[in-house]
Amino acid sequence: MNRIFGYGNKKSHDQLLQESNQSMNQAQQSLSNRISQLDTQIAQLNFQLQNIQKNLQRSNNKQPSLRKQALKILNKRKQLENMKDSLDSQSWSMTQAQLTNDNLQNTMITINALKQTNNAMKAQYGKINIDKLQDMQDEMLDLIEQGDELQEVLAMNNNSGELDDISDAELDAELDALAQEDFTLPTSENSLGNDMPSYLLGANAPPAFIDEEPNLDTEDKNKALESAQ
């Protein structure tokens, strides 16, 4: 029944704007065509009036028929000009309406884009739980503090283990032994084995004694040479 009586489905606001835009474009095009036709007719009437004027000048205004014809043409031209002025006013009104419609359509496009952006932002922010984010940050800080405490405990354990390996009695005995040793470095290679402590020489220490060559005087050397000959 609605279709029969012209009440179809309700159209959206965007569809109404598009249809009104199309109808105004068609109306403006029709007005432009009509104004162009009137301009052509007025130009033809002006050409006829020019010819009549030339004929009247030749006849010294002695032909009443030409004057009547010119008067009719002038009246017709005036009517056409009035029609053209009216159409120009209508065209200007249609142009203003078209501009208003275009602005409204652009505004609706902007509003729809803002609505879509707002909905998208709400959907994205809706997935974020600020309380959970804060809890996660607190947990991360706690884990960092626990890691720092663990490193401090490990460092303390390592240092205490090294100190606990040696007792106070052993430390005193070692210090006394070191005090009795002479750590003055020798000035020559011959005094290396005598002046350096034994525990610093190790397995590569030189022997405690060195055989020296006998001192032979000149006569003994000569006898040795004669016996050799």
UniProtKB/Swiss-Prot annotation:
Ranges where the record places region Disordered: 186-229
Any coiled-coil regions, as ranges: 9-155
Keywords, in A-Z order: Coiled coil, Endosome, Membrane, Phosphoprotein, Protein transport, Transport, Vacuole
Protein name: Vacuolar protein-sorting-associated protein 60
Lineage: Eukaryota, Fungi, Dikarya, Ascomycota, Saccharomycotina
Subunit structure: Interacts with VTA1; the interaction occurs at he endosomal membrane.
Chief location bin: membrane
Modified-residue entries (Phosphoserine), positions: S12
Membrane-protein topology: Peripheral membrane protein
Other known facts: Present with 2110 molecules/cell in log phase SD medium.
Source organism (scientific name): Saccharomyces cerevisiae (strain ATCC 204508 / S288c)
UniProt function note: Has a role in a late stage of multivesicular body (MVB) formation. Can stimulate VPS4 ATPase activity via VTA1.
